[in-house]
């Protein structure tokens, strides 16, 4: 399958959309018809996409109850929130600003 429980997200300065899964469920956990992979990631949807896109998680942004993501256009840093009562604010520093799939540091 693709992604589940996509909550909020955010537009990037380069025009793509970040979508956030707000459920870190995985195989062995019941969700609909069952799961075959881990969830709880952020995904980037390319601005130029004209059809379905193969979902590839931005693993370096962590796996948790993601709520939203916002990119600072001056630094390229991504600020992430969680959808939990005891949540925190995260900052992701990309290895290459504007190329989130290249990894970075949370």
Please name every model-derived segment:
Residues 1-106:
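Conserved small-residue
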């Amino acid at each position: 399958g693709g992604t589940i429980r996509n909550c909020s997200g955010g537009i990037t300065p380069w025009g793509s959309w970040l979508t956030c899964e707000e459920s870190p469920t995985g195989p062995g956990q019941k969700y609909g018809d069952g799961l075959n992979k881990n969830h709880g990631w952020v995904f980037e949807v390319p601005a130029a996409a004209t059809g379905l896109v193969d979902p590839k998680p931005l693993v370096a942004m962590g796996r948790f109850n993601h709520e939203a993501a916002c990119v600072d256009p001056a630094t390229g840093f991504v600020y992430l929130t969680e959808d939990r009562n005891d949540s925190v604010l995260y900052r992701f520093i990309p290895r290459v600003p504007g190329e989130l799939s290249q990894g970075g540091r949370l």
